[in-house]
From Swiss-Prot:
Family: Belongs to the DSR anti-defense 1 family.
Record gene name: yotI
Protein name, entry field: DSR anti-defense 1
Biological processes per GO annotation: symbiont-mediated suppression of host innate immune response
Keywords: Host-virus interaction, Inhibition of host innate immune response by virus, Viral immunoevasion
Length: 120
């Protein structure tokens, strides 16, 4: 069963991307897709700019990495980072709860919480 939760206030809907055989959140930024075929994980792209080369450096990290990094930043009361774009596929509501927790604390307008695809 597939459930799609849509944020009615969002400007974009969740769309199906046939190239990676999964759903993606079509945000206003450039979409960077993971090459992974694993549908039981989330893959986020976080804006990262270590050397200020060409204004920014985008890279993809796994859900485990982004959640661990997010928790570390929350503990240190550091909220100055943004999740700029994402591919979000979940088989567990635990993932949604973590994303919800982070989105409540991160100073980012990225509306990911209501955009979840459950594949189980």
């Amino acid at each position: 069963m597939i459930e799609i939760f849509k944020d009615t206030g969002a400007t974009h809907d969740l769309v199906y991307h046939s190239k990676i055989n999964t759903f993606v959140w079509d945000v206003e930024f450039d979409i960077v897709l993971s090459d992974s075929k694993e549908l039981n994980k989330c893959y986020f792209v976080k804006c990262f700019n270590p050397y200020r080369i060409n204004g920014k450096c985008d890279f993809a990290v796994s859900s485990i990495d982004i959640f661990s990094e997010g928790k570390r930043l929350l503990i240190e009361n550091e909220f100055n980072f943004k999740i700029t774009k994402a591919v979000h596929v979940a088989t567990s509501k635990d993932v949604t709860e973590i994303v919800l927790h982070l989105s409540e604390r991160i100073s980012s307008p990225f509306p990911i919480v209501k955009e979840v695809v459950y594949l189980d």
